[in-house]
Amino acid sequence: MDHIRNFSIIAHIDHGKSTLADRIIQLCGGLSDREMEAQVLDSMDIEKERGITIKAQTAALSYKARDGKVYNLNLIDTPGHVDFSYEVSRSLSACEGALLVVDASQGVEAQTVANCYTAIELGVEVVPVLNKIDLPQADPDNAIQEIEDVIGIDAQDATPCSAKTGQGVQDVIEALIAKVPPPEGDADAPLQALIIDSWFDNYVGVVMLVRVVNGTLRPKDKVLLMANGSQHLVEQVGVFTPKSIPRDALTAGQVGFVIAGIKELKAAKVGDTITTMQRKAEAPLPGFKEVKPQVFAGLYPVEANQYEALRESLEKLRLNDASLMFEPEVSQALGFGFRCGFLGLLHMEIVQERLEREFDMDLITTAPTVVYQVEMRDGTVITVENPAKMPDPSKIEAILEPIVTVNLYMPQEYVGSVITLCTQKRGSQINMSYHGKQVQLTYEIPMAEIVMDFFDRLKSVSRGYASMDYEFKEYRPSDVVKVDILINSDKVDALSVIVHRSNSQYRGREVAAKMREIIPRQMYDVAIQAAIGANIIARENVKALRKNVLAKCYGGDITRKKKLLEKQKAGKKRMKQVGTVEIPQEAFLAILQVDDK
């Protein structure tokens, strides 16, 4: 066991985490040069294109060190994005060490810090590495200073390397072997194995990626999943080099995969503990929690006959993504669709993109909302994730909204504009600290403000230099109201939004004005109104198209003209009673693009 090293790589997006992983795999001969490709651990197309890692992957490598010993290195690739922070914490708790990769030309950024703190809390040994030192603008001294200031770990002996050219990668592995402790654990104790990740394979069912903490796991063992108490028979165990290679057993300290004929992903939850039926472990490994969606949106097929296809696509996606939730929903305006729950905005974008790419779906997405807690007058508390389900205001005692703590990092010249943005978004400043040229701001901001367009606005006010991460803090009472949009005094449920009262007038006016541009003129007047409860706060009219009925009167008596105009008016009135206004697709997208001033 002294020769095993379990480690993962922590980095901000684009600091070269996947490239470094590629180099380490190549150096240890995990794949032949022919099989080697860029970002070998990012298996989804969308991961490669966006340059992000979504699912955790592993590679078991053997490396002959300079001291002549052969070490088994288990690389556990973690997602870097805040939406997947639970996956990150599970991957890190399976390791004893982590390589902290910092881009020498950019210094420390938000997600590096967030994941690094997670690692330190879990007691993982952090080994700093400076990447991209081959770039002309690299400034290693400044980067070292930032690591020490912001994260507070000693970085004087940080290993410089360039994952692109391969220079210094061997030093990185040597530093890793020297600094990271070998795993502790007893191969003869009752089995405890942590599920780091799980995904669905069409041939064998669910494949679980596990880190064996104590005990030994062999094929034909009867195992128990401790979170939900289900029992399964192990069919195969093995390791990834990233290719899968079967093994006879996985012992304490090793990382590998387990196939046990599980049919659905819900059974194998990330963070759960596996133990054997013969000798049960006394307690599960700590840290397991159910992942709860934070952001909800409605997904509707453009063509009504695509509903079943959408359900199938969502079910297939859920096979590989246990944190995706969905339930059927009916909207008067959009027909049948699904209310989906996501971990965060990036997760939502990825799911939408995968539906459109892998399953050829055409989708309409409603505005993303967060989960509100509503205290009713009769003392009950309900959760509302869909504005259309918000109860009648007269029955509501108080509405609580989720507040998140946001950490922002940016060069100091952008501080002013970022603070202005946070204040607009109803943020309250908690902390501000300077680290060299970088500034760290901590704010508490309502989550509802973040899901709308905070990230895009942050990037535009800081010219792309600011980076952020956020975590849920608590629910707080807030004066939020539901703004309904009425078209010819009919509510359009898909257009309702929940906003803060201070912003509701403006929001209502903006949406009504936007709808007026988008809804085509009809044969009769269309009234667009924004309402809070029974109070109308804004109104716009779309004027009717009308024929010039007086064209045939040459001069003549006024009563004749009046008669024709009255007749036209009566006809329009009749049409308005029976006519329905078709709301074009763009209208639903327009709601997402209303700027908050």
Curated annotation (Swiss-Prot):
Family statement drawn from the similarity comment of this UniProt entry: Belongs to the TRAFAC class translation factor GTPase superfamily. Classic translation factor GTPase family. LepA subfamily.
PROSITE patterns: G_TR_1 (PS00301), G_TR_2 (PS51722)
Organism of this sequence: Cupriavidus necator (strain ATCC 17699 / DSM 428 / KCTC 22496 / NCIMB 10442 / H16 / Stanier 337)
Record's bilayer topology term: Peripheral membrane protein
Keyword Signal: no
One of the record's GO cellular component terms: plasma membrane
Keyword entries, A-Z: Cell inner membrane, Cell membrane, GTP-binding, Hydrolase, Membrane, Nucleotide-binding, Protein biosynthesis
Listed NCBIfam families: lepA, small_GTP
Entry protein name: Elongation factor 4
Cellular compartment(s): Cell inner membrane
InterPro entries per UniProt: EF-4, EFG_III/V, EFG_V-like, EFTu-like_2, G_TR_CS, LepA_C_sf, LepA_CTD, LepA_IV
Biological role: Required for accurate and efficient protein synthesis under certain stress conditions. May act as a fidelity factor of the translation reaction, by catalyzing a one-codon backward translocation of tRNAs on improperly translocated ribosomes. Back-translocation proceeds from a post-translocation (POST) complex to a pre-translocation (PRE) complex, thus giving elongation factor G a second chance to translocate the tRNAs correctly. Binds to ribosomes in a GTP-dependent manner.
Enzyme class, spelled out: hydrolase
EC number(s) reported in the record: 3.6.5.n1
